[in-house]
Amino acid sequence: MTQQRPPLEIRLCGPRGFCAGVDRAIQIVVLALKKYGAPVYVRHEIVHNRYVVEGLQARGAIFVEELDEIPAAHRNQPVVFSAHGVPKSVPADAEAKNLFYLDATCPLVSKVHKQAMRHQRLGRHVILIGHSGHPEVIGTMGQLPDGAVTLIETVEDAHTCHFDDEDNLGFVTQTTLSVDDTAGIIKELQARFPNLAAPAAESICYATTNRQDAVRAAAPGCDLFLIVGAPNSSNSKRLVEVAEKAGARMSMLVQRAEDIEWEQIGDISVVGLSAGASAPEIIVDEIIDAFKAHFDVKIELAETTVETENFLVNREIRDVELTVKDMAFVNGEHRVVGISKLMQGK
């Protein structure tokens, strides 16, 4: 006699997973491989997800941390800069080495670069709210001369920082931060420096805000909340924090279904599921299938908004056709079809 599986509700968040900037960055590498052939070099992980990186490596991408790692024999092959953005010195170095490069910096990160440079042009010292060592922070700080930017990571930093000219300050933020935590830091800075200039537009990107809002709405009543993402993915780690603060009994970050420790989960009846902006949909499907092996699963789509943003790839590769098959290694079947199947229980 077959043992009956316990019932389980999975609240599948929407939006989740790839944002337009991540989609664009991966497409740039895929299209470069189609147009120019392998190898295509990529400086730093194109996005913070090993599954994506390994999938691109299998297609002929080679990942390096510095341009000096590109062999002289391959200097005629393209190099792609990651979605996180790079300091100004990197494209300058590429040009000095006569390298052909494609910049996959997210357009919303580029917007933050422009906001920081505008502050400086107006004579302001720039305050960057972000996490030390994150590639996006390194790239943003690298848009301005040494000493022109001060990094603030916490409310305590905001409370203790000092500046020579407190009347000429402007701030920008890393795009992937927690909306709530950033608000606290900005509030402290504005209390201490009343003339602090804000950026012309919100720095935290729409995708970060949307994913956090969806998790926040779905978390109450969840016994467990899983976020698909990498340990070095800032926006994924923030989603884990948001789930905990919003009422999930337990939340955790997983990269693959094999990371789930079933014996530690215990007695659960409601699970929340979302994915960071660099996590592919195919892993979300994998995790749902893993739960179906243990439970009688019912999918509830917990959608707070629908994203329609789309960013163009670089002009040099717009003549190359991108097919569903080209992106199947991360998307699986077309997303709309996938959601339809999930709602039908596959």
From Swiss-Prot:
It comes from Brucella suis biovar 1 (strain 1330). NCBIfam families: ispH_lytB, PRK01045.1-4. It comes from the Bacteria. GO terms for biological process: dimethylallyl diphosphate biosynthetic process; isopentenyl diphosphate biosynthetic process, methylerythritol 4-phosphate pathway; terpenoid biosynthetic process. Its cofactor is [4Fe-4S] cluster. This is 4-hydroxy-3-methylbut-2-enyl diphosphate reductase. [4Fe-4S] cluster binds at residues 19, 106, 205. One of its GO terms (molecular function) is metal ion binding.
